[in-house]
Amino acid sequence: GMAWARQFSQPTLYVAGNHEFYGSDLVSTMASLRTEAQGSQVRVLERDEWRHGGVRFLACTLWSDYRLFDSPEQRDEGLQKAQEFVRDFSRIGLTPDFPDRFTPAVSQMLFDQSVAWLEARFGEPFDGPTVVVTHFAPSPGSIAPQFVGSPLNACFVSNLEAQILRWQPCLWLHGHVHHSCDYLVGATRVVANPRGYAPKGEVENTQFAPNLLIEF
């Protein structure tokens, strides 16, 4: 979490994932993260742009849109499984003043707002490489082979490949999945390098590269 991120002396970009919000709400969690990052090299980004060394970074959580599947039947099954198995909808609130819980509808609304924000940013001229950083995955290419066809994939992945082919950032970094990814959507390299869970000190993702360095 933030204590880990604060120990780095280099600029560190922090994009909240779903677990950051557990036991709290969307508004309070973001405010707390920004407060905790003060006085450090950590930049907490949510629909925020940051430029460094001639590179433009665009970052947002990018909650799932639950439109991954084409057929209504598959979408309905995905929503049913999500509400049955995903803890986001029981452990995340919306604001500190109301008891309303996070829902797939709110997730989709936030997704659409984030995509509109990205569209606006890519509509602005920038003479240099652009890196997008999200928590949730932007392409079915990030689905692990053993989970292909699972209705729960809608909770992890949205399909922004058409937009990526138009925008063509040089790099898209994401989290949420528990396996490593490195593939291309057009000229955009999509990379995930998660540690995964670490029960009893063991790293879930054996392909995790703690010193991964990406050059572009």
What are these regions (language model features)?
Residues L13-N18, R43-R47, V131-T134, I164, ...:
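Active-site neighborhood of phospho(di)ester-bond hydrolases with catalytic His/Asp-centered motifs
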Residues L58-V131, F136-F147:
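Active-site-proximal loop/helix segment associated with metal-binding centers of metalloenzymes
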Residues E20, W50-R51, L62-D65, F136-P140, ...:
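Short, solvent-exposed loop/turn segments at secondary-structure junctions
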Residues T35-G53, F57-A59:
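Metallo-beta-lactamase
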Residues A37-V42, W117-P129, A162-C170:
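A structural motif corresponding to the C-terminal end of an alpha-helix
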Residues G1-S9, N18-G39, H52, L68-D70, ...:
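Metal-dependent catalytic neighborhoods of phosphoester/phosphodiester hydrolases
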Residues R51, A144, S150-C170, H178-F216:
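Binuclear metal-dependent phosphoesterase catalytic core
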Residues D25-T29, V106-W117, L152-F156:
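Soluble or luminal CAZymes and related metallo-dependent hydrolases
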